[in-house]
Amino acid sequence: MRERILMNRDWRFLADPGADPVPKTQSAMYLSSKTERLKWGPGGWRHNDTPGFWNLYGELHNEPWEKIDLPHDYLIDQTPDVRENSALGFFRYYPAWYRKHFTLNENDRSRRLVLFFEGVTGIAEVYLNGCFLIRNNGGYNSFEVDITDIARFDDENVLAVYVNPNSYETWWYAGGGIYRNVWLEKSDPVAIERWGAFIPVRQTGVAE
């Protein structure tokens, strides 16, 4: 049986992050080069998304993370500016990060775990516990990623999504962000695929 858990509550959001700052310590560079789980930046598992706190490497940062719920469009609150592109609603389009912390129980170890995104504007890069999983191009399609081999059951999981709406898919206001639901789906290792099973018809005619 497939269990679906809505993941829309309690996300962290960072708008227009710019380039990741270069770490000041040798230890940060060393650890980041050794394992995906200690990668530097907002996609990393141990990145501190609480403003004003010391990070894993003993450096103070003050990123303006916000607490938000999904669905979320982070561009719509702007005041339209005539200096921006009229075809895109006179809004400035810029990238952003989303992060969500969640836990799994021991009973989930034997199950297949999939994250299903109903819609993310533009280009989306998905990380779990610092590991890059998938890049999706297109804000008008759903997509999924299997996290069974990356998920942690003895510690907190951190899902990070980098959104870049500058893909110019439209000539109208397209918005920016995770603008539809996100689901965590748990199933048996062997289960019917999402869109069901079917038997192709190889010939037509009267059934016998």
Regions found by a protein language model. Name each.
Residues 52-75:
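Predominantly extracellular/luminal regions of secreted and cell-surface proteins
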Residues 1-60:
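Hydrophobic alpha-helical membrane-insertion signals
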Residues 203-208:
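Contiguous beta-strand segments within globular domains
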Residues 81-85:
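Short glycine/threonine/proline-enriched tight-turn/helix- or strand-capping micro-motif at secondary-structure
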Residues 3-5, 12-19, 45-47, 73-77, ...:
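Accessory beta-strand-rich segments of carbohydrate-active enzymes
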Residues 25, 32-33, 50, 64, ...:
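Serine/threonine-rich low-complexity intrinsically disordered regions
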